[in-house]
Amino acid sequence: MADDREKSTDQMKLWKEGRGSQRPDVLTTGAGVPIGDKLNAMTAGPRGPLLVQDVVFTDEMAHFDRERIPERVVHAKGAGAFGYFEVTHDITRYSKAKVFEHVGKTTPIVVRFSTVAGEAGSPDTVRDPRGFAVKFYTDEGNWDLTGNNTPTFFIRDTLLSPSFIHSQKRNPQTHLKDPDMVWDFWSLRPESLHQVSFLFSDRGIPDGYRHMNGYGSHTFKLVNAQGQPVYCKFHYKTNQGIKNIPVEEADRLAATDPDYSIRDLYNAIANGNFPSWTFYIQVMTFEQAENWKWNPFDLTKVWSHKEFPLIPVGRFVLNRNPVNYFAEVEQLAFDPSNMPPGIEPSPDKMLQGRLFSYPDTHRHRLGANYLQLPVNCPYRTRVANYQRDGPMCMHDNQGGAPNYYPNSFSAPDVQPRFLESKCKVSPDVARYNSADDDNVTQVRTFFTQVLNEAERERLCQNMAGHLKGAQLFIQKRMVQNLMAVHSDYGNRVQALLDKHNAEGKKNTVHVYSRGGASAVAAASKM
């Protein structure tokens, strides 16, 4: 029945109804010149060639030829929505950030959800981490929290980032997804065990974007009005309840409704079923960080909720769909270096790398003036600096104000109260190898204590079902890493691989051994 159609399916109909009795606008060129005919090109005679003076055609085609912008290297497929963040608990003892300044304060936000490895046209229901990035339009500039639906990540050293992403993408010759690439990297870098185990658990395929938690993942630093700092992690827990999709259903949806998650989010908001999340922090003092048994800045590990309990802060609600996807989602750009006073980076190596990488890729993808785009603009504060010109400068370029600093003409000046907090660092500069920094203990806890028996069985089945596509020597190396976590983990996956491999003999390959991290070596250090 037509009356049963989803709001997303009826978007065009609803747009027309929203105009009421308004007459159609006059069709124009990009320069605003009215157009008399949009169906027929201007030619010399009914069968003749086109005329160069047909500016209706050239204006249309020239713009069409330039519609596409570079696709995001990662997080290419996504959905977005707007809403607000509301403070429900006072945390001013930890942070002076105005976004937290009093209970009841609300701040506009925009959120982008995404898959990670797939291209813009890939299915929503693949086994993949989900991006969960939040932009807060605060009184003191934008705060971008670039999170995921997982509290950990695959690597802890940012220098590995390009190679890790390459391993998850397509083979450079065949242009196919390659299990050898994926598992070769993971098995050579056993710090990935924690995230890989989470990925192949039930939570590896969340039911849309509304039924999953989010995490800032990185370690950050909060500073209060007295200049006292603490380290923190950010968590946002779904108020819709955790729901995941079984493998068979995910495969079916990938074929029949590849945009399942985008559709689900859009329709929920359009129907007034606004999704929300409760926002928490974990706090660790500098003294606790010095004495903690693990590196508190290691992105492959979590902070124990028993030692560092969740502290409620607020909630955020998504209550508006984008008016235009390209303008408000495709051009949406998150930068973890956007931190208002009271929120600062920690020594987290992955965060440090992303402070450069994220804005750098936005300048490539959107241009030097991407922060002038309405969705990225810090519209709740006044931007005043000495940056000028560049492609697509869309405002007054700061008029006649001086474009150099310092100057004697009352142009923007610094305010010492906004100086970053002091911090101590090691004087010993080197390339520190952290490959064997206990890659197994927290994974063992996840396998034996977080998961129940049915979940452990599904984890092993999911992992073996993907690992079977890799070469035998890669399978063997990965199982050795799992054995270092727990013998039951390794034995289960090996038994399933033996069954898969018996069904089709693998090609034998000869390889040269390479130096790499070893989960077994890490276990032996415990």
UniProtKB/Swiss-Prot annotation:
Q: What does this protein do?
A: Catalyzes the degradation of hydrogen peroxide (H(2)O(2)) generated by peroxisomal oxidases to water and oxygen, thereby protecting cells from the toxic effects of hydrogen peroxide.
The protein's required cofactor(s) are namely: heme; NADP(+)
From what superkingdom does this record's organism come? Eukaryota
Positions annotated as active site in the UniProt record:
75, 148
Q: Does the record bear Heme in its keywords? A: yes
Q: Which residues does the record give as heme binding sites? A: 358
GO biological process per UniProt? hydrogen peroxide catabolic process; response to copper ion; response to hydrogen peroxide
Q: Which family does it belong to?
A: Belongs to the catalase family.
Q: Keyword annotations for this protein?
A: Heme, Hydrogen peroxide, Iron, Metal-binding, NADP, Oxidoreductase, Peroxidase, Peroxisome
Q: Where are the compositionally biased (Basic and acidic residues) regions?
A: 1-22
Keyword Transcription set for record: no
Q: Which GO terms describe its molecular function?
A: catalase activity; heme binding; metal ion binding
Region Disordered: list its residue ranges.
1-29
Q: Which reaction does it catalyse?
A: 2 H2O2 = O2 + 2 H2O
- Please state the Enzyme Commission number of this protein: 1.11.1.6
Against Pfam families, the record matches this protein to: Catalase, Catalase-rel
Q: What is this protein called?
A: Catalase
